[in-house]
Design a protein with these regions (language model features):
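Fold-core signature of tandem repeat domains
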Residues: 5-8, 26, 40, 62, ...
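Structured core of small recognition/catalytic domains
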Residues: 147-231, 235-245, 249-251, 256
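N-terminal beta-strand motif that seeds the catalytic metal site of vicinal oxygen chelate
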Residues: 1-16, 62-65, 115-150, 177, ...
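Short, charged/polar, Gly/Pro-enriched secondary-structure boundary elements
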Residues: 46-50, 57, 107-110, 120, ...
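Core segments of cupin and vicinal oxygen chelate
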Residues: 2-48, 94, 140-185
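Exposed loop/turn and edge beta-strand positions of beta-sandwich/beta-sheet ligand-binding modules
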Residues: 4, 61, 96, 135, ...
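Vicinal oxygen chelate
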Residues: 80-132, 170, 216-265
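Helix N-cap motif at beta-to-alpha junctions
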Residues: 14-15, 69-73, 145-146, 206-210
Length: 265
């Protein structure tokens, strides 16, 4: 059975409010086993979104993503076979959602968990199989060795390549796409270059226009439920144009922390 892209973690100074944003706008369901002192977890029925407090020395935004596999030992062996320099490390026991952390050839970090084991205690496990009208469709990664990283995720995790006529790589687990975009400093002409790493998340929705209306209603109900402005000023306009090059989204916004989100039907 191919691996499953099972969660995304977003670091935020306002992590409870940011989780509430996803719950309110995208209909994600809150975990029935909350751990509010550590994180707030919501889910769409397939992917869990873990809103975590930003720790010292760390940046806000998308922190990492998670992959669920059938056999951890076999997966770690596959990682080492792909490149002996790649490593995995066991996570502390207080982290119930994943057993190990690992990285790809460009040092993009991801979590590893095994299906049907006891420590998957949260929304990732409890909502399995339920489809919600608004759900995460893709996770975008912008990285220098895009082709090599794509080979890594295909060979190690069995993700399926999707053919598209552009220079990006699209890998699917059957429901969610890992989009790998080549990082080039030339793409950042007219703006501050962003570090390589996780770039944005995308949602598939029943109606883009309804999402826009729901955003207006949400801000009217609670003025704190407002994402960051996009496309303002020359640099902001350049950032938005780069973001809009992703062919998987047609409406662009951010969460409260500034994490980039694109939406399509």
């Amino acid at each position: 059975m191919p691996a499953k892209l099972n969660h995304v973690a977003i670091a935020s100074d306002q992590y409870p409010l940011n989780a509430r944003f996803y719950e309110s706008l995208f209909g994600m369901k809150t975990s029935s086993k909350p751990r509010p002192s550590r994180s707030v977890v919501v889910g769409d029925g397939y992917v869990g979104l873990n809103s975590i407090p930003r720790r010292e020395g760390r940046c806000s935004g998308i922190d990492h993503f998670g992959i669920e596999v059938d056999d951890l030992d076999d997966t770690i062996a596959r990682i080492t076979k792909f490149d002996a320099k790649l490593e995995a490390v066991k996570r502390p026991p207080v982290r119930p959602f994943a057993a190990w952390s690992a990285h790809d050839p460009d040092c993009n970090v991801f979590d590893l968990s095994q299906r049907n084991i006891d420590f998957q205690k949260d929304v990732y496990a409890e909502l399995g199989g339920e489809t919600r009208p608004r759900h995460i469709s893709h996770i975008a990664l912008r990285t220098p060795q895009a082709e090599r990283c794509a080979d890594f995720y295909v060979n190690v995790f069995g993700l399926t390549r999707q053919n598209r006529p552009d220079g990006n790589f699209y890998l699917s687990d059957g429901r969610v796409t890992l989009m790998i975009i080549p990082w080039k400093i030339g793409d950042y002409y007219g703006q501050d270059p962003a570090r390589s790493g996780l770039d944005h998340i995308g949602f598939k929705v029943e109606s883009v226009e309804q999402v826009k209306k729901d955003m207006q209603f949400l801000i009217g109900e609670n003025p704190l439920m407002h994402g960051r402005p996009l496309g303002y000023g020359e640099e902001g306009e350049a950032r938005l144009k780069l973001f809009q090059k992703c062919p998987l989204g047609c409406f662009h916004l951010t969460d409260i922390e500034g994490t980039l989100i694109d939406v399509a039907e």
